[in-house]
Curated annotation (Swiss-Prot):
Protein name: 6,7-dimethyl-8-ribityllumazine synthase
Gene Ontology MF term list: 6,7-dimethyl-8-ribityllumazine synthase activity
Residues annotated to bind 5-amino-6-(D-ribitylamino)uracil: F24, A58, L59, E60, A82, V83, V84, N115
UniProt pathway: Cofactor biosynthesis; riboflavin biosynthesis; riboflavin from 2-hydroxy-3-oxobutyl phosphate and 5-amino-6-(D-ribitylamino)uracil: step 1/2
Function recorded in the entry: Catalyzes the formation of 6,7-dimethyl-8-ribityllumazine by condensation of 5-amino-6-(D-ribitylamino)uracil with 3,4-dihydroxy-2-butanone 4-phosphate. This is the penultimate step in the biosynthesis of riboflavin.
Family: Belongs to the DMRL synthase family.
Catalytic activity: (2S)-2-hydroxy-3-oxobutyl phosphate + 5-amino-6-(D-ribitylamino)uracil = 6,7-dimethyl-8-(1-D-ribityl)lumazine + phosphate + 2 H2O + H(+)
Metal-binding keyword on record: no
Length: 166
């Protein structure tokens, strides 16, 4: 049996990417943003095709992502933040709710969202992960934007095939 295969496509040329960055734990979030934007540029996403907005913290990220999705202006989005464990249940609440909100927005609007919210035990762990996570999010956003576009084009081909049968 033959199987089709769609290879990873990391060509960011012409893609419009939105980034929502939390300001809480600002030094970590600034490093995440710097790494993400630098990687987007390496992948061919033009600076003017990237919009960065900031929100107070991780719990506010899903709403900003939702508003960006509603605009219809973005091929993919990136969520950047850092949640550092404390001595209360708040860590679990923020981690779980922000992650669930991000997933829901992406599925509701069929827009790829790379989740770059670090959930760590210490500030040191957060700083150690910023470069790699920022780059990974840029790559995931570009790859998924291209994959979604390719899969959407299959639906268009099916519609054309049905028209040909008539």
């Amino acid at each position: 049996m033959d199987h089709g295969f769609y290879p990873s496509n990391l060509d960011g040329e012409g893609l419009r990417i939105g980034i929502v960055q939390a300001r809480f734990n600002e030094p970590v979030c600034a490093e995440l943003l710097e790494a993400c934007v630098a990687e987007l540029e390496k992948l061919g996403v033009e600076g003017e095709d990237t919009l960065v907005v900031t929100v107070p913290g991780a719990l506010e990220i899903p709403l900003a992502l939702q508003k960006m999705c509603e605009s219809g202006q973005f091929d993919a989005l990136v969520a950047l933040g850092a949640v550092v464990r404390g001595e209360t249940y708040h860590f679990e609440l923020v981690s779980n709710e922000s992650g669930a909100g991000i997933t829901r927005v992406g599925l509701d609007f069929n827009v790829p969202i790379a989740n770059g919210i670090l959930t760590v035990d210490t500030d040191e762990q957060a700083h150690a992960r910023t470069r790699e996570k920022g780059r990974d999010c840029a790559r995931a956003a570009v790859e998924m934007a291209n994959l979604v576009a390719a899969l959407d084009s299959l639906r268009g081909q099916e519609d054309e095939d049905e028209d040909d049968d008539e």
